[in-house]
């Protein structure tokens, strides 16, 4: 029986093959003078090149060459050129085995290389076992081991030896971690954890399954369901210190395993492992459920506000008829009075003849009532949501362990008094600003009526959580921001930031650039040379660009797509996986081994991408039933694996010759696409009026200039898209190579402009109402006369300088991956008071936005690039809509995780299609040229790899029984 391998063929190649790219050859295989001196001591050319190749292989990847190993032509040419020896000389090298062995002995003697034996091997084994806890995968640990061997001049042992060593080290590390967690638990806690698996609840589900089934809701019943779970978890009394010494990725892995196991499966594993998984789940779920409660409260507040606003609007709308009649009557009365005055008629008679005095009294009362109605605002109606809050809020405030900044102290004190459910004789309003509109409504309340005051507290508590003035300990989303920001020393060492640590250097640079830019714009305004626009009397006018598609491009596009072969979606997936091996990313959550059932895994990915679901796919495929697909999905399909697979496909597509026609991967666009969830979309049951009354979510996708969708996020349909732009750019290597990022008006905020510049991205927005945007300058008095009416204010240099260290730390924290940019930007945008850090970043953003606006006005090429980039992103929507064939295009999953996998699967399938189309479009171009037909290079950028007419998407999904690898 053949031995089972841990590494895939591609992983082995990445770890042990000789490099062939020019950069690696220059880095590792450039020979020094001493090397050349040692090599020239070999008399024959074949011995010189053979000796040199053995030396190069020992240096990188660190192994000995195998007898009869085929050396890549690139390596032979590179090494031979340094020696003046032809590559073919290697053919006669080491006809005697002793020659190769003698050369190896000489290399070991000269350079100090040693074999993996004895004390050195024991030391490396101990070192590897020590590294295993921090390693994220078999491949990661193997890479660390290989690097360590190179550092210690140890020749790599056989691949099978490294596989066994890494596997043993990872298993030992896993057991050490499980034992360490179990030893931190008391006997009572262990008993309580075991009871989670034995206690059965209504519906014949275990307490463990009941605990892990939680989702963010939007009503008081959902909040109470979450509170039931949080209160139960608190009774288990497991301290976070039990996990203090465990690496974060190990905790996340144990949690994900616990969320994949059925109850019976957990009962059957070893006790230490079971207790470790259960303890991690309890600690992690406690924090996650607390976050979900805060998010549910956020949605309830939003729902209450929307209902109050709707009632306010309906009240005003219902008063329109009465208002019209009243105004007409008063108009007639006024006309009668004016006529009587001119005729000399007594005014009393004019009033009596126009309207009776009783009628006039009624009109005055009606007018007063209408005035009050029109002066009202939605706040007058939010008190009607009191009973909704009362059903869960006191309990929530008792359960949550609130911590706050000093500025939010009065608010937390008010919230705790609500949680204690004690009557408040004279409610404090110190948490309100003096100018707050709440004050007027609260003063109008009867003495002793605290209902509106409680609603005000809960509204402001929502805002405080958003801004970070109030936080929860151990929370990922609502934690203390100060604990997340990297220290200033670490921030200054961050080479990824595009700005200096000294604010004066930044200010000097921006002042110089802004002065030059303003002079350029003023000169263009005076001379009337603004492309497609003008500035007249302080008013900016910009005309939209027209389409620029050359004649004949459409005919070429149609011809190339006619040459594309028809293909089943199943065959396409097999072909792309055979070429790229993207399914290798889907390792087993427990063992880390790649999935051996490639067809089953592709079925799961296809079910996600086409929005079919596993049951429908099981009915449509000829290879797997539902339970087989469910097992594969449960243990192999993870968010991280989806991202890795996407990165593999995107990176490969970017290397295709046809991709270079569209761009070099240095620019990208981002846009949100709405997906309806209908009444089944309970996890994100949020309605955006822009898309009608149907609840839904958005897939916010980043698309490179090569059409590759390199990042995709699921976001609520109601939120602003702007904070999520930087998330996608920092998500993987493709995004980090982007220098110019395009977005539409939905991506516009000054905070985003500021953060983008700090991270080195040139943000280019297609702002719909650009002429209404004002410029911000350092000295308005020196602004050219033609532009003074466009200036909106003066940049606050002192504020920027005072807060520059914190701004710098925020940027470094984002690049370090400690917090998502969207989370940080949302917090900064949510401060109810004018926070200094938020205001300073806004000032930075205003300067960057001013520089961008001037450049946009003067640079038609930038406008054209943005239009092309955004068109590429929007063109993806049509392909994704075509792929979303299941469930009438609705995302009906009830969980946030399920919805995320639907969106991620759709994006991965889209990337696979784009890769396949790019390959075959390149073949079609070559075929056309071989036929002697013209393929104008200027036409090729107008072709896109987003067509799908040649792909069979529906019907049965048939797979070969033994696919070719």
PLM regions: where:
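Long amphipathic alpha-helical coiled-coil/heptad-repeat bundle
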Residues: 2-511
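Short linear interaction motifs
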Residues: 32-40, 587, 594-600, 650, ...
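Short, hydrophobic/amphipathic alpha-helical patches that form generic packing surfaces
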Residues: 51-60, 574, 578, 600-611, ...
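Short, conserved catalytic/metal-binding motifs centered on acidic residues
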Residues: 62, 617, 668-674, 741-746
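Catalytic or ion-translocation cores adjacent to nucleophile or general acid/base/metal-coordination motifs
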Residues: 89, 619-660, 687-805
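Structured, charged N-terminal subsegments at the starts of enzyme catalytic cores
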Residues: 515-620
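Structured nucleic-acid-interacting core domains from mobile-element enzymes and related host factors
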Residues: 649-686
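Long, compositionally biased intrinsically disordered regions
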Residues: 782, 789, 796-965
């Amino acid at each position: 029986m053949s031995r089972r391998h841990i590494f895939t063929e591609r992983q082995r190649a990445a770890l042990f093959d000789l490099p062939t790219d020019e950069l690696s050859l220059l880095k590792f295989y450039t020979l020094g003078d001493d090397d050349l001196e040692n090599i020239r001591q070999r008399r024959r050319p074949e011995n010189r090149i053979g000796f040199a190749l053995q030396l190069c292989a020992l240096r990188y990847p660190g192994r000995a060459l195998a007898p009869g190993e085929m050396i890549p032509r690139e390596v032979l040419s590179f090494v031979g050129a340094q020696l003046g020896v032809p590559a073919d000389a290697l053919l006669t090298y080491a006809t005697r085995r002793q020659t190769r062995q003698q050369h190896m002995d000489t290399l070991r003697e000269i350079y100090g290389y040693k074999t993996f034996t004895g004390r050195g091997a024991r030391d490396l084994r101990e070192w590897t076992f020590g590294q295993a806890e921090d390693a994220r995968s078999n491949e990661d640990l193997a890479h660390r081991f290989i690097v360590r061997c190179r550092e210690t001049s140890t020749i790599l042992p056989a691949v099978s030896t490294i596989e066994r060593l890494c596997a043993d080290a990872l298993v030992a590390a896993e057991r050490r971690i499980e034992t360490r967690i179990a030893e931190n638990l008391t006997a009572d806690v262990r008993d309580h954890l075991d009871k989670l698996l034995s206690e059965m609840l209504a519906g014949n589900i275990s307490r463990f399954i009941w605990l892990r089934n939680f989702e963010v809701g939007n009503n008081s019943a959902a909040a109470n369901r979450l509170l039931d779970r949080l209160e139960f978890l608190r009774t288990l009394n497991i301290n976070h210190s039990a996990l203090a010494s465990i690496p974060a990725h190990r905790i996340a892995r144990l949690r994900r395993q616990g969320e994949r196991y059925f109850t019976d499966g957990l009962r059957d594993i070893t006790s230490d492992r079971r207790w470790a998984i259960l303890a991690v789940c309890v600690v992690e779920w406690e924090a996650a459920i607390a976050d979900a409660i805060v998010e549910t409260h956020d949605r309830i507040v939003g729902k209450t506000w929307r209902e109050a606003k709707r009632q306010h609007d309906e009240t005003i709308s219902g008063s329109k008829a009465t208002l019209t009649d009243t105004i007409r009557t008063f108009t007639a009365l006024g006309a009668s009075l004016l006529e009587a005055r001119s005729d000399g008629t007594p005014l009393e008679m004019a009033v009596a003849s126009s309207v009776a005095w009783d009628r006039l009294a009624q009109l005055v009362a009606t007018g007063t009532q209408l005035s009050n109605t029109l002066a009202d605002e939605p706040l007058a109606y939010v008190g009607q949501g009191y009973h909704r809050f009362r059903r869960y809020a006191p309990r929530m405030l008792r359960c949550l362990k609130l911590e706050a900044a000093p500025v939010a102290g009065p608010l937390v004190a008010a919230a705790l008094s609500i949680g204690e459910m004690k009557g408040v004789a004279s409610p404090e309003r110190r948490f309100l600003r003096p100018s707050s509109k709440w004050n007027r409504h609260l003063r109008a309340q009867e003495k002793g009526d605290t209902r509106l005051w409680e609603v005000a507290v809960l509204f402001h508590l929502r805002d405080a959580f958003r801004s970070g003035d109030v936080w929860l300990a151990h929370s990922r989303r609502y934690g203390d921001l100060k604990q997340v920001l990297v220290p200033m020393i670490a921030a200054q060492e961050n080479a990824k930031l595009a700005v200096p640590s000294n604010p004066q250097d930044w200010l000097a640079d921006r002042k110089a650039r802004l002065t030059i830019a303003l002079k350029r714009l003023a000169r263009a305004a005076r001379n009337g040379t603004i492309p497609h626009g003008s500035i007249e009397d302080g008013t900016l006018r910009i005309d939209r660009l027209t389409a620029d598609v050359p004649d004949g491009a459409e005919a070429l596009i149609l011809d190339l797509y006619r040459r594309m072969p028809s293909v089943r979606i199943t065959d396409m997936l097999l072909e792309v996986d055979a070429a790229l091996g993207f399914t290798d990313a889907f390792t087993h959550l427990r063992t880390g081994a790649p999935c051996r059932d490639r067809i089953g895994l592709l079925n799961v990915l296809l079910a996600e991408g086409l929005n079919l679901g596993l049951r429908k796919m099981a009915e449509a495929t000829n290879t797997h039933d539902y339970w087989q697909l469910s097992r594969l999905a449960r243990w192999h399909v993870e968010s991280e694996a989806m991202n890795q697979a996407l990165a593999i496909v995107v990176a490969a597509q970017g290397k295709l010759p046809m991709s270079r026609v569209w761009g070099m991967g240095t620019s990208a666009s981002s846009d949100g696409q709405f997906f309806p969830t209908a009444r089944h979309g309970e996890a994100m049951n949020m309605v955006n009026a822009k898309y009608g009354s149907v609840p839904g979510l958005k897939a916010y996708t980043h698309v490179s200039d090569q059409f590759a969708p390199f990042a995709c996020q699921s976001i609520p349909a109601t939120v602003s898209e702007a904070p999520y732009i930087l998330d996608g750019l920092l998500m993987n290597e493709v995004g980090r190579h982007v220098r110019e990022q395009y977005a539409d008006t939905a991506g516009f905020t000054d905070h985003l402009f500021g953060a983008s510049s700090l991270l080195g991205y040139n943000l280019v927005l297609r702002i719909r109402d650009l002429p209404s945007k004002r410029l911000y300058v350092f000295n308005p008095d020196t602004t050219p006369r033609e532009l003074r009416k466009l200036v909106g204010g003066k940049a606050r240099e002192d504020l920027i300088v005072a807060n520059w260290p914190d701004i710098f730390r925020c940027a470094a924290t984002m690049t370090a991956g400690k917090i998502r940019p969207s989370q940080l930007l949302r917090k900064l945008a949510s401060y109810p008071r004018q926070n200094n850090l938020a205001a300073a970043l806004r000032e930075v953003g205003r300067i960057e936005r001013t520089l961008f606006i001037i450049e946009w006005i003067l640079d038609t090429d930038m406008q054209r690039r943005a239009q092309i980039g955004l068109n590429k992103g929007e063109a993806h929507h049509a392909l994704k809509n075509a792929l979303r064939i299941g469930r009438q295009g609705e995302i009906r999953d009830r969980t946030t995780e399920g919805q995320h996998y639907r969106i991620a699967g759709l994006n991965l399938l889209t990337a696979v299609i784009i890769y396949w189309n790019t390959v075959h479009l390149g073949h079609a171009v070559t075929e056309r040229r071989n036929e002697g037909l013209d393929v104008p290079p200027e036409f090729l950028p107008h072709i896109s790899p987003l067509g799908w007419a040649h792909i069979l998407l529906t019907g049965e999904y048939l797979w070969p029984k033994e696919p070719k690898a």
